[in-house]
Amino acid sequence: MSILNIVPGRLTLAELRRVSRETGLQLQLDPSSHAAIDASAATVARVLSEGRTVYGINTGFGLLASTKIAPEELELLQRSIVLSHAAGIGAPMDDSTVRLVMALKINSLARGFSGIRRQVIEALVTLFNRQIYPVIPQKGSVGASGDLAPLSHMSAVLIGEGEAFVDGVRVPGSVAMRSAGLEPITLAPKEGLALLNGTQASTAFALEGLFAAEDLYVSATVAGSLSVEAALGSRTPFDARIHEVRGHQGQIDAARLYRDLLAHSQIEQSHENCGKVQDPYSLRCQPQVMGACLTQIRQAAEVLRVEANSVSDNPLVFAGDNDILSGGNFHAEPVAFAADNLALAIAEIGSLSERRMALLIDSNLSKLPPFLVNNGGVNSGFMIAQVTSAALASENKSLAHPASVDSLPTSANQEDHVSMATFAGRRLRDMAGNTAGILAVELLAACQGIDFRAPHQSSDKLEAAKGMLREQVPFYDKDRYFAPDIEKAAALVASGRFNSLVDGEVLPSL
């Protein structure tokens, strides 16, 4: 059993990748967090005993913030906000996303600025460790005031409401709590608001997009290197001197990855004196384009790392000052920007891949058989596979439109500017799936092209990559039912198996 010890505010991207990908991972709160959590909850109780009026603790919410709530209704207030705000719609989030949402919320609450009792946080930890995942609809948040609807669905289970998946079966929240050995919680003042206010759903979606983008980046670098080999491309564009004088670190690192993958190839030696002057941009400018994508991925990763460790609810409790302050940390604009930048990178990775694949099937450019198959005319080979790539690349261009530039006022104009971060992060999954499909087609095409270069072989690393594909998809000696091969190659692309072939330090969470 693998255990992740959470020291609040110190989660790494590699640990968050584990939360998303490792089903049996167990969480535990580091004991060092207890004092801050307890002090924060005690501050809320003390403020109430002093008769102070504080937003969200003894007032209404949003436009109703000026409504004072009687002491005997404070617990009902917290229960009511969870129930009324659980207004999401659409298919449930995947388990991997819910795990991230829960872990992020645990990490944030445990920093001790939310005024919530330790037993509530520990209940979330117990649900996570028992693999009891709240049913959280994917749609219904605008990323300010936090991810209210998604987090309300998560929180509803804690009070015995809503629904959760237990062993894959959808059950009422009360049943889920019993399955975890817990009683439904009566929320104390501030606790309902602390649970449902925050950016954890948007951040979870964006983190999953980040991890997918990293896997796609590696797969695209491998596929692009294979295409260089299949097309008898030049190594000169990857020379370190070219990239050093431009100075962009992403470009420098990208070129190094290509050099490492392409080193010591028989295919390269076979055409050293071919007289070719320059390759098309889709081969020659890979370090420049993929370097820019790497820069975007790294920048987004840093924003998301900070956000994953942030306190993003409202109001915030500063126990040392005996003070509770209202602000706007719930506004997910940083997450929206990061997700939009990831969308650009994912789209461009796919766009460049589609162009390389189109080059390979064009015998005038690649000097390979037309559409990468013998007996052309009878066989159509990769003709329509390229059309599929073009369709996916075009769809990604629309999906890459920045979500963060949109805003619709909510809550009777009290919340008059929102981030749309939840959609910004959520659409990354569709985009990543599209790009995995594009890369799958290129991978199939490039390996087919390299097989046509026999008896010459590629580098050891690229032969290893080709071997991973050939374990599942054989050479195309004639036309056959194509779709299953694309599916197998896409699964390989998305699996992260190619990550072992590159320097893991290049990408933030590897």
Curated annotation (Swiss-Prot):
Gene: hutH
Enzyme Commission number: 4.3.1.3
Subcellular location: Cytoplasm
Residues forming coiled coils: none
One term of GO molecular function: histidine ammonia-lyase activity
Annotated keywords: Cytoplasm, Histidine metabolism, Lyase
2,3-didehydroalanine (Ser) modification, residue list: 145
Domain of life where this protein originates: Bacteria
Pfam annotation, one family: Lyase_aromatic
One of the protein's GO biological processes: L-histidine catabolic process to glutamate and formamide
Tagged with keyword Lyase: yes
Pathway: Amino-acid degradation; L-histidine degradation into L-glutamate; N-formimidoyl-L-glutamate from L-histidine: step 1/3
Chief location: cytoplasm
Cross-link (5-imidazolinone (Ala-Gly)): 144-146
Reaction equation(s) it catalyzes: L-histidine = trans-urocanate + NH4(+)
NCBIfam families registered for this protein in UniProt: hutH (TIGR01225), PRK09367.1 (NF006871)
Enzyme class: lyase
Name of the protein this chain belongs to: Histidine ammonia-lyase
Family under the similarity heading: Belongs to the PAL/histidase family.
Processing after translation: Contains an active site 4-methylidene-imidazol-5-one (MIO), which is formed autocatalytically by cyclization and dehydration of residues Ala-Ser-Gly.
CDD domains: PAL-HAL
